Amino acid sequence: MTNMTNRLLALALVAFAAATGACGGDGSSAAGPDEAGGSPQFENPTGAAFQLPPGITLKGKILGGEGGDDGNGGDGCQPGARLGVSPTYVEVCFTIHNSNAEDDTLRLPAGLIFISKNIETQNGTQVREEVVVVPGGRDTTVIWELHCLNAHRDPSTEEDEFTIGPVSDHPGLREVIALVAGKLIDQPAASLIGGAIWEVSDFGGLTDETRDALRALPPASAGAAAARARPALRRQRPDKPTG
């Protein structure tokens, strides 16, 4: 990776940390999205409805978690297939059942939104499609690390529940998804992408600097070698406001 690319990544992450109180609000405010600074479209997301394939059904609740790499979600969630790049501020865990005799494929599209039942907890999304093979006649548990969409809300916890929302049609989020299509998404890239989503959801839209940083991400085909050459940058969870 070039020095210019590293510099863009570093500058973007510093800007995100300085500009946001994201995903760490104290949850005490009942303010509406305009007062809190967020986009109304991420409070009540719009877009195409998501449909599970024939024969595949959701079994039980969609539970929240606190994120991490231990392979386990919240209480009541069995270890399962982990999707996304950890750590994040929104984690969901759900079990699906395939009533078909044959294995089937579940495609979770980029921009699919999971909506928290608690309005003090983040909604979440991801920027790339994930694919899960669901064995015929069996249950499969999925633990998915998601980017947060409401900077003034709290990160998810094991006490949260979610519902499956639409595939977002928000122009800003669709732009982020397009910019990172085919890119290598490791921890530094996920931090950069998370900050880009905050810009879209709560700070008026992407800056040109962020667009340049997203374009500069290496292609997925670069693999582990590119990841080793990248700077060890991580988005830190901001402290909660003290007053």
Question: What residue ranges belong to the model's regions?
Answer:
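Intrinsically disordered, low-complexity Pro/Gly/Ser/Thr-rich segments with frequent PxxP/GP/PP motifs
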Residues: I115-I164
